[in-house]
Amino acid sequence: MLNRLCPRLVPSPLFGFSLANLARLDPEVVCGIVYGGMDEVCVLAINELSRWWFSLSRDRCSACGSRASEIDEDWRYCVEGDAGIAVLEGLVQLCDECHLAKHLGYALTHGRFEEAIKRVAEVNNVSEELAKQVAEETFKVHGSLSKIRKWRVVLRGLSGLSEGVIKVVEYVLNFVMNNNYKLSNNYWLQYRGQNKSEIEERAENEALELLRSALGLEGKNSMRIVIELSGEDLGKLVNELANALNNYGIRVLKRETETALRLVRGSEHVRDNGRVGIKLGSMGGKWMVFVPSGLRGVVMRNVIDGLRERRLDYIVKTPGVREGGERPVIVYVPNFLAVGMVNDVVEVLLKVLNRLGVNKPLLFKPDVFTQEGIYSGKAGGMKPYIYMTSLRLKGFH
């Protein structure tokens, strides 16, 4: 029906998994995650993929014949039982307008759907009504395919890459796709575990226990209790928290911690209509450690493995792009008042760092500091974290 330019939507579980994205990632980070250590064959293969991808010519749009600006991956999707197979049949050159029309989901979320439909109709010499009918069917197919959770990637039609490189790239894509990794729009590699509810429930219960022991307060929602605390109670809570974490070798910055609790209770924000509203904060937070770029993937994978053994694999992330120097590995905790979990998570981190010979401080930053833009050097003397520890403080030798 549409012979020259046919829209095709990527199933939701496959978002972010592409040659284009993989070619932009740091091979040491990716291969460290996939293999749990440095794998030279993998690093060489990803480097070769990157060189090949960025050398591809962009001459003429295969749909309309104008100057091409994009290399589009021609993925086909099929279903085998309860699993899906994503087959890359090859690459096509597209101009900006035809590339937008090919990816209607992107066009829709960016307010350019009508523009994309007009392009589909124009290039295929059909009516806009017919183009919209095809688009409607495309979204229905996308909805069905997105319900499939298990996928396998098959790579074909990649002339210019050796079979060895294609085999490694295919393995890497299948590993990250089937092991709960995602690539965000700003190229963070992120892992999300499968027992989210269990971890959040444990964290909430631990926070409620701290509030009960520190202040004698009962309730079912730790955030609601914190919101209603008086200034005096905040001070008592911080002291109790400091005592509890100090017993684990974790230092608590009392001023910063009290600030975080006050921000959880809400901060004033000017809305789009000019009115001032109260924006509630989050009880979540994350441990951060800055490690050499060549070790980030290895650290991340080993930390995830350790957390999974203790059923604490919640959210872990690190920058995926090629960057020199030291960059963070970040491990999330659902509630920064969950004393036991805060300690258990950092214990896993420290064991991995100790095994790899990395001696760096670990800092815990509450999400409310991120929300309020409290970063190092920008907070008027306020540290951008509330807890810190290290191998020495934890008694590692």
Predicted regions, residues:
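A boundary/linker detector
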Residues: 1-52, 58, 68, 111-180
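Short active-site loop/helix that positions an aromatic residue
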Residues: 80-83, 301-307
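Short, conserved charged micro-motifs
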Residues: 85-86, 294-301, 338-344
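Polybasic, proline/glycine-rich intrinsically disordered low-complexity segments
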Residues: 125, 176-182, 308-397
